[in-house]
């Protein structure tokens, strides 16, 4: 059958091109040498890029040397080499640049690669499996860019990439909406339990 996926949109044909992640990404290290005051972000397992103030409420950067931090722009990627195997990899969607810890690995998509498609690829179970296989270390696995770049995969035309990305992004949005509805229903149920079952005390 060739190098094609099991499930495919009918308008596309032809084999996907074999490659490595190093063929479709470009590693970069843009340091904040000018000490530009930018918002500080972290890469989380489930929420992607978030302001550090949301993750560490008491974080105070006054007097901290920020020239070693890395600058990230819209559509750039970053991951935590010690936690990529549990989902700590994301694409930055902010309209203005931010800065992140120097510990993160940063990269961009090459020409001909859709960033949204790439993000779905990098979070796919098969690719995540290879994060562990290609990582180094004992109890904690570290995956730095040279080993990340060796992971083998395949990619279709840019048109097919975008079609796939649009579908998967739509499904993600529906799941997010449904989860919010579930959370509201759970809150409602708790309120009903208090009103219907719990007796007044005192």
Question: Which stretches of residues belong to each language-model region?
Answer:
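Short amphipathic coiled-coil heptad-repeat segments
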Residues: 1-14, 177-202
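A short glycine-rich beta-alpha junction/loop motif
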Residues: 2-6, 82, 98-103, 136-159
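Non-catalytic DNA-recognition/assembly elements of restriction-modification systems
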Residues: 8-32
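Proline-centric
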Residues: 10-15, 105-115, 133, 146-165
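DNA target-recognition patches
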Residues: 28-63
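A short beta-sheet element
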Residues: 64-127
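Extracellular/lumenal glycan-associated surfaces
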Residues: 162-174
């Amino acid at each position: 059958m060739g190098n094609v996926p099991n499930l495919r949109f009918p308008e596309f044909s032809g084999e996907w091109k074999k490659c490595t992640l190093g063929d479709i990404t470009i590693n970069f290290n843009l340091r904040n040498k000018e000490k530009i005051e930018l918002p500080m972000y972290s890469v989380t397992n489930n929420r992607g890029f978030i302001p550090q103030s949301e993750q560490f409420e008491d974080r105070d950067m006054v007097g901290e040397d920020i020239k070693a931090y890395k600058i990230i722009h819209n559509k750039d990627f970053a991951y935590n080499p010690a936690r990529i195997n549990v989902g700590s990899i994301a694409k930055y969607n902010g309209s203005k640049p931010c800065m992140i810890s120097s510990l993160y690995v940063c990269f961009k998509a090459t020409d001909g690669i859709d960033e949204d498609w790439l993000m779905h690829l990098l979070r796919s179970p098969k690719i995540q499996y290879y994060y562990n296989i290609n990582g180094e270390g004992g109890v904690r696995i570290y995956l730095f860019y040279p080993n990340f770049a060796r992971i083998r995969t395949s990619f279709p035309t840019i048109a097919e990439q975008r079609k796939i990305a649009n579908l998967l992004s739509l499904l993600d949005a529906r799941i997010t909406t449904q989860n919010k509805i579930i959370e509201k229903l759970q809150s409602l149920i708790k309120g009903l339990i208090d009103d219907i079952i719990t007796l007044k005390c005192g």
